[in-house]
């Protein structure tokens, strides 16, 4: 690469054409004055005023771009991670020494709220500039993969924010200087710790320039590079697309900085001007890249793939354990050597409650649909939520679909019964009871006999699968398998469980017009046999007396 100090006036004009759009009206003034490369690197605010660049904002944009050229021209062979840390430490020491010497002066008055002197502000600006130069290295590969350096980077950013806030805050000079001294002391400690703890040779290696040729680019294929522009005009490659010209070259890595495109320096340019320069020659591109040292971090290219969100697969059974053959071990080692894929943000499913898309079947609980057609199943992945659609179709069915279920063992497949939630009729006299099925009584009574396979267990499961639709409890015929006997006068009652009172009971089939009768064991019923017999014998006599009175009234 030709040094910037050797640029001709034409090269300076070509470089200024890629700067911000607001600076384009001044290009002809650079061309008129025939400013060369050496004059460009030494340009100042006063020189820009003479050129006709009167706006302060426009002057700052030009000077920032020139600073990048100065760093490229003078600091390429000297800038290392170690030197940048030392520069930051020296800047913090200079600011600390300035404040200490200023406080020793007899004319020092820290109880005033005047603006700090220019020397103080200049030292602060130099410190922040040194921190920015170090952060530019820490924010790029291979240093982003080191945990300790990532923590150091975050601390330096926070300290720089605290420093700028303290300087701009309207307060006493002594108070402001105390805050600045605290920040400076922490920065000194970070620099010392970084120098002591880091022994990798990459800290002492400088960046280098490498020229990359991308020939034979097919029309419409593209180069396959992902470029991110920083706020100050640096263009950093973040990754490459797999099997693209950039990926096939094996020379373009994430973290590389684009310096030239087709022999034209693009440092400080707008990103759109850089892209236009890349598309200038459709058959091929020549890039000049600035590469950070790799050292012992084994940094490899990082291709990017176009990934879509896919739901996690549900593993129904554990995979069979097989011994690895030498061929499979070799394939695994080859896969490890492939470039790692950069982490992409893959959007998760929507956070709102998901409602499956279905045009033919309605899964709502409003109507009493008796349709017995099999549920439709989608084929393929129509959307990221197609997995949720299929899952909802497996889970949702109405009571009318219970006849379609295949036979299975109730003991092994039925989930534990849970108490129903509060319903609108909660608290009314009508008791909330469960049906008189052996399956449900087996949960209430741990000594009950297990039920066998049959349709009755399936009906019970499907009838009470949902808390929202519970069919009327029907009377169940007496069976000799029941452990508990009932009196003759209570044959119209069915056996159930009262979850309100926490006991078992006999329930009439019509829950709306019956009361709950406490269930008693056989032993306890023997004691009350005489009382129940008296009550049963007393009922006919009471009826006869009422009939006799009715006859007397009719006469």
Curated annotation (Swiss-Prot):
SMART domains: PDZ, SAM. Pfam families: CNK2_3_dom, CRIC_ras_sig, PDZ, SAM_1. InterPro entries: CNK1-3_SAM, CNK2/3_dom, CNKSR, CRIC_domain, PDZ, PDZ_sf, SAM, SAM/pointed_sf. Residues 80-174 form the CRIC domain. GO terms for biological process: negative regulation of ERK1 and ERK2 cascade; negative regulation of peptidyl-serine phosphorylation; positive regulation of sodium ion transport. GO terms for cellular component: apical plasma membrane; cytoplasm. This is Connector enhancer of kinase suppressor of ras 3. The lineage of its organism: Eukaryota, Metazoa, Chordata, Craniata, Vertebrata. The gene is Cnksr3.
